[in-house]
Regions:
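Membrane-interface helix-loop-helix junctions at boundaries between adjacent transmembrane segments
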Residues: 55-131
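C-terminal ends of transmembrane helices
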Residues: 43-54, 89-103, 142-152, 196-206, ...
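Alpha-helical transmembrane segments in multi-pass membrane proteins
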Residues: 13-15, 33-45, 61-70, 82-90, ...
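N-terminal signal-anchor module of multipass membrane proteins
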Residues: 1-50
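C-terminal transmembrane helix-loop-helix hairpin of multi-pass membrane proteins
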Residues: 1-13, 168-269
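Structural signature of hydrophobic alpha-helical transmembrane segments
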Residues: 25-40, 72-86, 122-138, 179-192
C-alpha cells in the first residue's frame, strides 16, 4: 500500500474536511450519524464485494462515501434512517446500476439525490459556509487542488470552478443582487465535497480529458438553469431546488458515462 496513492490522499482530504467542519461548526450534528453511515457503507461494501465478486474490496471508497453522506445529509432532528438507507443505497448502486462493468453514478451523489427527491420533507443538504475563516478555506483548497493534481483530475475541478464563476456572473446579471452572494457557496464544505470527490470520481467520469471538461461544464450549466428556475418559480424544476449541483450531476453524469461506454463498446466491435 502506497500512501502517496491518490486514493489515500483523497481519504486524508475528506477527513480534513470532516475534522475542520466538526471542530469549527459542528456540522455532523451527532457522532451517531457518522457511525451509522460509515458502518453501513463499509459493511455493505465488504458483503457485496465478497458475495458478487469473490473478494473483499478495498474499503477506502466506502470510507469516502460514508464521510460524504454523513457531512452532506441533514435530516430532521433525531432520525437516523436517512443515513442508514443512504449508505446502503450508495454502495449497492455500485454493484447494481452498472453498464459494461462500470457504475454510472458516483455513489454518494446517487444516494443523496435520491433521498432529496423522494424524501424532501425529511432530508435536506448541508448548507454551512466557512464564513470568513480564510485559513480553513486556504488549507482545504490548497490541499484539495494538490490532490486533484496528483490524481490527474485537476482539469475537471478547475473547469467546474471556472464555469461556476462565469455562470454565477450571468445569473447575477439576470436576477440582480450582490455578486459575492452568488459566489459564496463555492467556499463552503458542500461544494468542496462536490468539486473534489463527486465530479472528479475516476470511476464515474468519461474516458477523455476533453470529455470530462465538457461534462462538468454541462453540469454547471444545468445547475444554473435549476437555480434560475427557482428564481422565476418554474414549477417543473421545483423538485430540484433543494440541491442544484447534486441533482444536476445526478442527471448529466450517468448520461455522459453511458454514452461514453456505449461508444467505446461500438469501437471495440
Amino acid at each position: 500500500m502506497k500512501w502517496s496513492d491518490p486514493k489515500y490522499l483523497i481519504v486524508f482530504l475528506i477527513t480534513l474536511v470532516l475534522v475542520a467542519g466538526e471542530a469549527r461548526y459542528d456540522i455532523l450534528g451527532g457522532y451517531d450519524r457518522l457511525a451509522t453511515t460509515l458502518g453501513i457503507c463499509i459493511a455493505t461494501e465488504v458483503v457485496l464485494s465478497w458475495w458478487l465478486r469473490g473478494r473483499v474490496a478495498n474499503i477506502a471508497s466506502a470510507y469516502i462515501t460514508g464521510i460524504s453522506l454523513a457531512l452532506l445529509t441533514k435530516p430532521q432532528a433525531n432520525i437516523l434512517w436517512p443515513f442508514a438507507l443512504g449508505a446502503f443505497i450508495a454502495i449497492a448502486s455500485k454493484y447494481v446500476l452498472i453498464y459494461r462493468g462500470r457504475h454510472l453514478w458516483n455513489p454518494s451523489n446517487f444516494a443523496i439525490a435520491l433521498l432529496v427527491l423522494v424524501a424532501s420533507d425529511s432530508v435536506a443538504i448541508l448548507s454551512h459556509q466557512w464564513g470568513n475563516d480564510l485559513r480553513i478555506n486556504l488549507i482545504i483548497w490548497a490541499f484539495g487542488l494538490a490532490v486533484a493534481w496528483r490524481a490527474r483530475v485537476l482539469h475537471v475541478t478547475l473547469t467546474y470552478v471556472a464555469c461556476f464563476v462565469l455562470l454565477a456572473a450571468v445569473r447575477n446579471a439576470i436576477v440582480g443582487g450582490p455578486l459575492l452572494a452568488e459566489l459564496a457557496p463555492i467556499t463552503g464544505p458542500m461544494y468542496q465535497l462536490f468539486v473534489f470527490f463527486m465530479v472528479t470520481d475516476p470511476r464515474t467520469t468519461v474516458s477523455t480529458r476533453r470529455g470530462r471538461m465538457l461534462v462538468v461544464a454541462i453540469v454547471a450549466l444545468a445547475e444554473t438553469i435549476i437555480r434560475l428556475g427557482g428564481d422565476f418559480q418554474v414549477a417543473l424544476l421545483r423538485p430540484f431546488y433543494p440541491s442544484p449541483p447534486i441533482l444536476a450531476l445526478a442527471i448529466v453524469g450517468p448520461i455522459a458515462m453511458w454514452w461514453d461506454l456505449y461508444r467505446q463498446g461500438r469501437k471495440a466491435t
